């Protein structure tokens, strides 16, 4: 979030509940954290920050054990605008937001990270803004501001089955 304290403790935008009190996670983030998700044993955070803890991490970072890590090397491979949603689907991290680039690729609001590299999927068009990603059973649902997804009419809500898009309800 945007919070910087809990009671008398300094907690910069990321906190954990230990069963009785809130505690900071290292030094927190230097700007807004919008979304958090678990992917395996790693805790991923997305937002509009440029560092988490002592790590440069433009818009996306993960916590493994007791340390923060950047995804894809931090600054040179960061996200160029806000991340609004994260989902772990088919052993990959999916990100949605207002961005147009991740790493060195064009990605109009939607991309995935396989642990080694970024890729796009489903042919999003410029102007696509993704606000929410949700995994249900074997499908990834995508909500946002768009009229088509992957060449099909899908006003603001679409379903990805791992290989193809369909309009919600189809």
Model regions and ranges:
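Extracytoplasmic surface signature
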Residues: 1-170
